[in-house]
């Protein structure tokens, strides 16, 4: 049964967290207090509607069958673990996988927004990654923009008859990369220097050194995890839902 399998994997996932996460010296995407107040408010307001819609859909999804809550928890744990593996990058930020592609494929972008939002709160409060003042900005880049792109790419490729594994890989990879494009724009808007465009390009260029290899790795891992879940009968409900 998938329930026993998922519980076992939860233990392994959280064990990996404590084994692999380095001592946090940088924040999740954008660290606490790094953004000016006007941008804190702006990103909070922009992100709020996605969270509200996501909570409504999450409540509905949680009632769909006995394995729904476990599958949601698995998707959330996947985001938590991958987004906690950090590499230093731009000052005031860092590079890491996002893990949101899998949830976007299985549950859609709005539920993924809520899962990512919850993950960011836990990381800000318990691991000192990110912060409450930058929660809106970080949620928008990782849990709104990334999942929307991942979901759109996956659905578009599936309708075009593209191989499922390649569709999953490209969706997860591009969702990861878009997260950092948006983060670069957020940093450039807050600190434009002499040119907003050049500032954004500068941030993107620095992120690219670490993020492109990470995005490729995340794409591969997402394919492996998706195929792993598809082997279990109780998980097929959500796997097959993602394929239509």
From Swiss-Prot:
GO cellular component, one term: ATP-binding cassette (ABC) transporter complex
Alphabetized Pfam families for the sequence: CbiM
Main location per the UniProt record: membrane
Bilayer topology annotation: Multi-pass membrane protein
Gene3D superfamilies for the chain: 1.10.1760.20
InterPro entries: CbiM (IPR018024), CbiM/NikMN (IPR002751)
Signal peptide bounds: 1-27
Keywords assigned by UniProt, alphabetized: Cell membrane, Cobalamin biosynthesis, Cobalt, Cobalt transport, Ion transport, Membrane, Signal, Transmembrane, Transmembrane helix, Transport
Taxonomy, superkingdom: Bacteria
Known partners and oligomeric status: Forms an energy-coupling factor (ECF) transporter complex composed of an ATP-binding protein (A component, CbiO), a transmembrane protein (T component, CbiQ) and 2 possible substrate-capture proteins (S components, CbiM and CbiN) of unknown stoichimetry.
NCBIfam families: cbiM, PRK08319.1
HAMAP family named among the record's database cross-references: CbiM
Protein name: Cobalt transport protein CbiM
Gene: cbiM
């Amino acid at each position: 049964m998938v329930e026993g399998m998922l519980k076992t994997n939860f233990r392994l996932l959280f064990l990996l967290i404590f084994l692999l996460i380095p001592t946090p010296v940088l924040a999740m995407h954008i660290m606490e207090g790094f953004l000016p107040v006007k941008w804190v408010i702006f990103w909070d307001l922009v992100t709020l509607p996605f969270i509200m819609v996501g909570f409504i859909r999450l409540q509905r999804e949680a009632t769909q069958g006995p394995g729904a809550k476990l599958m949601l928890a698995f998707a959330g744990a996947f985001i938590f673990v991958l987004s906690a593996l950090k590499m230093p990058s731009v000052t005031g930020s860092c590079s890491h996988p996002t893990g949101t592609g899998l949830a976007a494929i299985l549950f859609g972008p709005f539920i993924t927004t809520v899962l990512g939002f919850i993950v960011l709160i836990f990381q800000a409060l318990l691991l000192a990654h990110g912060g409450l003042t930058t929660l809106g900005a970080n949620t928008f880049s990782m849990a709104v923009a990334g999942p929307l792109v991942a979901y759109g790419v996956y659905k578009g490729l599936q309708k075009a008859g593209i191989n499922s594994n390649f569709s999953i890989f490209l969706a997860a990879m591009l969702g990861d990369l878009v997260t950092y494009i948006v983060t670069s724009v957020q940093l450039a808007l807050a600190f434009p220097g002499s040119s907003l465009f050049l500032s954004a390009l500068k941030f993107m260029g620095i992120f690219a050194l670490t993020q492109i290899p990470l995005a490729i790795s995340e794409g591969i891992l997402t394919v492996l995890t998706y195929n792993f879940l598809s082997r279990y009968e109780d998980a097929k409900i959500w796997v097959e839902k993602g394929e239509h």
